Structure formats: C-alpha cells, structure tokens
Swiss-Prot record:
Gene3D superfamilies documented for this protein: Bira Bifunctional Protein, Domain 2, Serine-tRNA synthetase, tRNA binding domain
Role played: Catalyzes the attachment of serine to tRNA(Ser). Is also able to aminoacylate tRNA(Sec) with serine, to form the misacylated tRNA L-seryl-tRNA(Sec), which will be further converted into selenocysteinyl-tRNA(Sec).
Record-linked PROSITE patterns: AA_TRNA_LIGASE_II (PS50862)
GO molecular function, a single term: serine-tRNA ligase activity
Assembly notes: Homodimer. The tRNA molecule binds across the dimer.
UniProt name for this protein: Serine--tRNA ligase
Reactions performed catalytically: tRNA(Ser) + L-serine + ATP = L-seryl-tRNA(Ser) + AMP + diphosphate + H(+); tRNA(Sec) + L-serine + ATP = L-seryl-tRNA(Sec) + AMP + diphosphate + H(+)
SUPFAM superfamilies (alphabetical): Class II aaRS and biotin synthetases, tRNA-binding arm
Pathway: Aminoacyl-tRNA biosynthesis; selenocysteinyl-tRNA(Sec) biosynthesis; L-seryl-tRNA(Sec) from L-serine and tRNA(Sec): step 1/1
CDD domains: SerRS_core
Signal peptide per UniProt: none
InterPro entries, per the entry: aa-tRNA-synt_IIb, aa-tRNA-synth_II, aa-tRNA-synth_II/BPL/LPL, Ser-tRNA-ligase_type_1, Ser-tRNA-synth_1_N, SerRS_1_N_sf, SerRS_core, tRNA-bd_arm
Family (UniProt): Belongs to the class-II aminoacyl-tRNA synthetase family. Type-1 seryl-tRNA synthetase subfamily.
C-alpha cells in the first residue's frame, strides 16, 4: 500500500500519477474523510485531556471532604463521549485503510506512459528465430503425437486447463525446473526454499493479491472463529516474500535472494476464451520464482539484475526472446516498474510472455511491515521487494518443444538439459 502520510499531503499529485495507469482516485471523498479524521482525532484528544484533568480533581476534592459525586458523574459523561468518538474514529480509520488497500502502486518515473500493452516498449532482443524448412507444428500436436501430453485424460479427471504429462516430456518438464534452480542457486546467488502451497489471508494481503484479486484464487478453507482461511498459492512470490513479514533484517544480511520451485494455482477468472488450447494458460502450472529483498537505494539495480537472471535461462536454452518494459496502463497492481520477457513460439509466429519481473518498492513491505535496520539509523526502515519468474516451467517447455522440433516430429533435447535427462539427445 502507499504511504498514508504521502496520500494525505500529496493527494492531488498522487491522483495524477495514478491516472496514468488508468486508476481514478476519488480525491473529493478522500479529502472529506481526511478532514473528518482530523476533526475526530482532535475531539478525541480534547476529551481525553478534559477527562484526565477532571479525574485528578477527584483526589483533591476527597482530601477537602467535598462531595465527589458530581465530579464522578462528569468524568463518566466525558468517558462515554470519548468512547463514542473513539469508535467513530476507529470506523473511519478502517474505511481509510480499506481505500488505501485498494489503491495500486505509483509507477516509477522511468516507466513509459501508456494505456495498454500496445504501448509497452521493447528494450532488447536476444537470438534469431529459427527458419524451418518444413511446416511447424504446435506443442499440442507434437506432445500428443509423442504420447507425452494428455489433455483428454486431464479433462476427464479434473476439467479444462489441466494437463497430464508422461514419459520423456514429463522428464523434460522436471529437468527444466531442476536446471533453473541449479542456475539460480549456483550462479546467481539465490537460496533455495521449500514453501507451503497453502497460505493464509494475511499473507495474501501482504503481497497484494487480497483484497482486490480474491476471485483469481482457489480458496480451500473459509475463515472461521478458529483461524484465517487458506488458499492455494497463485505464485511462490506469496510465501517467499512473506518470510520477511513482521521482521527486521540486519542491513549486513541484505540483499536477501530466495528462489523456489512450486506448483501455482490460478482460477484465470478474467481469461475466459483466451489461450484455450495447450499449456499457455493453465489452472495449475509449475514455476521457479525469484524474490529479492533489498535496500531502497538498490532496488532499481536489483530489478535489472533479477531480469537478467531470468533472461539467462533462455540464453542457456538458446531460445530467442525479447524484453519489454510495461507502460503505466499495463503494470500489475503492486508494481512500480515491470519488465516482461517474451519467448519466441514458432507455431504462433510471435513472442509470448514467459516471465514478469517487477520492483514493488515499499508497496508490499508497508503491508507486511518488512523492515531492515541500518547500523547508523535510529529506527528500522521499510525494505523494497522484487519478484519475477525464473521461469514459468510449462511455458518454457512449450518453447523448447516448438523451437527444437524436427521434421519427423521428434524433439531435440537442448544441450544444457541433457545432464538432467540421462544424456538423452532426442525425444521420439
């Protein structure tokens, strides 16, 4: 969430910056609520001071042998008024907090202005798409012919947007995840973590999935008097980042760099009719996630390095890709700046997103109270958090199958994956 003090003191400027990402902040309503908050705060403090002053006079009256009943009645009346004002203030603060939780992050000044994905800006390309001398097939046809992708069985068992992988295709899927983890932990300095696949509401609030995107989640257990509800993770970003919730990290221990390979679960509530064929958009998919916790002054450089770590996976797999910076109107809710990496898919004759790398600055940290303490500082300060896919395993599998296909329908195994597949050079 945004800094409440900044919202109060820079309301008009905040509204202007939010408008660039298509979010209309109700300035008039917020101004009125803020005036009411000030009024209630002042009234509460005045009533508290009056009650304290009169309460002190009770002892003095008793010492003089005076009747304290009128004073006691006055104190009681002030107490009732104070309780009423406190309740009004608490309800108002709850309203203000709910509004603050619904406001997206401010775009960084370096983010290009734009309304939607058509105004994203390409920043670089790597590799040249292969020219095939035969008609290319998509991953669905190739995978089904090889007996490695079974969509029909998945539909029978669960429903649409699920997959059963078998044989060497399943092995390649596993090999990709292992390769990514080994790369990030041995060459990029990340610590591997094994995390829960179920998280509570406080964790989802911390990383920004709640309250706005509840319909995108798979909820497994509703909230009760005994505890919070539980939901399946949409990304390992949620448990990895929440490790820092309500903690103070020593400056000497920064940056914190974590990675995890997990299944991810998304309802794809707003994606009806999109990418209905194949593995591109599934309810359950594997992903290797990258998370960094850094000092504020280091976060933009960290975004560049994190994006580079994700790109390295594609470079080692020799898959052509391009990197774009998202414009203000296409960024995610909690992001201040995002780079999307798009891999070349021959069957679609286009680049498709395979990773999204974002700097959240202190947006998540404020929600989670994730802080660090510098030696020279008197008080802890909020961390900056970053996250990105390194990579989405299923989409990487799609890219490998399509880019490494042969005319006879077989798939050449990329050299970097062969050690993970017992030296296998070809599937089929």
């Amino acid at each position: 969430m945004l800094d409440p003090k900044f919202l109060r003191t820079e309301l008009e400027a905040t509204a202007e910056r939010l408008a660039t990402r298509g979010f209309i902040l109700d300035v008039e309503r917020l101004s009125k609520l803020e005036e009411k908050r000030k009024s209630l705060q002042m009234a509460t403090e005045e009533l508290q001071a009056s009650r304290n002053a009169i309460s002190k006079s009770i002892g003095q009256a008793k010492a003089k042998g005076e009747d304290v009943a009128p004073i006691m009645a006055q104190v009681g009346d002030l107490g009732s008024q104070l309780d009423t004002k406190k309740q009004e203030l608490a309800e108002l603060l709850e309203t203000l907090n709910a509004i603050a939780m619904s406001v997206p992050n401010l775009p960084d000044e370096s983010v290009p202005a734009g309304a939607d994905e058509s105004e994203n800006v390409e920043v670089r390309r790597w590799g040249t798409p292969k020219e095939f001398n035969f008609e290319v097939k998509d991953h669905v046809e190739l995978g089904e012919t090889l007996g490695g992708l079974d969509f029909k069985a998945a539909v029978k068992i669960t429903g649409t947007r699920f997959i059963i992988m078998k044989g060497q295709i399943a092995r390649m899927n596993r090999a990709l995840a292992q390769f990514m983890l080994d790369l990030h932990t041995t060459e990029h300095g990340y610590t591997e973590a094994y995390v829960p696949l179920l998280v509570n509401e406080e964790s989802l609030l911390g990383t920004g999935q709640l309250p706005k995107f509840g319909e995108d989640l798979f909820h497994t257990k509703p909230a009760t008097e005994e505890g919070q509800g539980l939901s399946l993770i949409p990304t390992a970003e949620v448990p990895l980042t929440n490790i820092a919730r309500d903690t103070i990290i020593d400056e000497a221990d920064l940056p914190v760099k974590l990675t995890a390979h997990t299944p991810c679960f998304r309802s794809e509530a707003g994606s009806y009719g999109r990418d209905t064929r194949g593995l591109i958009r599934q309810h359950q998919f594997d992903k290797v996630e990258l998370v960094q916790l850094v000092k504020p002054e280091d976060s933009m450089a960290a975004l560049d390095s994190l994006t580079g770590h994700a790109e390295t996976v594609l470079q080692k797999l020799e898959l052509p890709y391009r990197t774009v910076v998202l414009c203000t109107g296409d960024m995610g809710f909690g992001s201040s700046k995002t780079f999307d990496i798009e891999v070349w898919l021959p069957a679609q004759n286009t680049y498709r997103e395979i990773s999204s790398c974002s700097n959240m600055q202190d947006f998540q940290a404020r929600r989670m109270q994730a802080r660090y303490k510098a030696k020279s500082a008197k008080k802890p300060a909020l961390l900056h958090t970053l996250n990105g896919s390194g990579l989405a395993v299923g989409r990487t599998l799609v890219a490998v199958i399509e880019n490494y296909q042969n005319e006879d329908g077989s798939i050449t195994v990329p050299e970097v994956l062969r050690p993970y597949m017992g030296g296998l050079e070809k599937i089929g």
